[in-house]
Amino acid sequence: MATIRQPVSQPVRVALGVAAWALIIGTWFALSHSKLLPPFALPDPLGVIKAFGALWTEYNLLGNVFMSWWRIAQAFIWSALVAVPLGLLMGAFPALFHFINPVVAPMRSMPITAFLPAFMALFGMDEGMKVGFLVFGMVFYLLAVVVEEVSKVDEALLETAYTLGAGTPQTLWLMFRASFPGVFGSFRILYDIGWTYVILAEMVNARKGVGYMIEAARKVLDFERVYAGIIAIGVAAFLFRWLLTLAEHQLFPWRRAVAPQIRTPFAAK
């Protein structure tokens, strides 16, 4: 019997992952052929695979995935440009934190979907609205992470800097360098958030993107193509998350060395 926090070897982790997906796909096959659910609610997996092939050959799946990624990338850059310096200052100066936090803290709990009509009214329905909507969904999360990571900087490190004659700009730079590895680690989740919201943004007056592709399939009741689009989102998001994980391991190898042996089930390997 497994004990609490008992380490699991790499072969066992792989086997458990394969078993989990086999269980999901097997259940999907069974339910779709049992007629317990209508075909539009749960189409046949083989039909979804064929639809995936059609998306690739006939509907420019790769181009649509790239367009969705490009929108997320733009929102990511704008979010970082706002949240990283502001979060650094909030983490460094408590007075600024207590001035801004009462405004931004409630925004993290609000459903972003409720703001979509407001963004359409303010910015129209072009690319600016879509990117702005994604920034709104990402920036408050990143801001909280930056503030938290800056607050974790060891006070002894700051005292050493002061002793060596560092001024405020040098100390802020030191705090940024000390906190950035943790901030970079949050970029994976930030991209996941972007993939979650980009679909909603692309359902409004879009001509490209995975969200547009799914919405177009839904309008003609092609639910096999809808499910194929959903799977495409999952695959694309996983690949980008994996690339960010590789980048983190290359930039900050010491974080992997000192990380705890027990990882959460959803932690990137």
Language model features: what each stretch is:
Residues A105-Y141, E148-E149:
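Generic hydrophobic transmembrane alpha-helix motif, especially the helices
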Residues T3-P7, H33-I77:
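Periplasmic/extracellular loop-to-transmembrane helix junction in inner-membrane transport proteins
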Residues G132-F136, T168-L200, Y227-A228, A232-I233, ...:
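Transmembrane alpha-helices
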Residues V145-S186, V210:
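Short cytoplasmic-facing helical segments at TM-TM junctions of multi-pass membrane proteins
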Residues Q74-V104:
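Transmembrane-helix boundary motif in ABC transporter permease subunits
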Residues M1-S32:
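N-terminal signal-anchor/first transmembrane alpha helix
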Residues A121, T196-I233, F252-I262:
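Glycine-rich helix-loop "coupling/hinge" segments at transmembrane-helix boundaries
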Residues P94, S151, P181, A228-K269:
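C-terminal transmembrane helix and the adjacent membrane-cytosol boundary/short C-terminal tail
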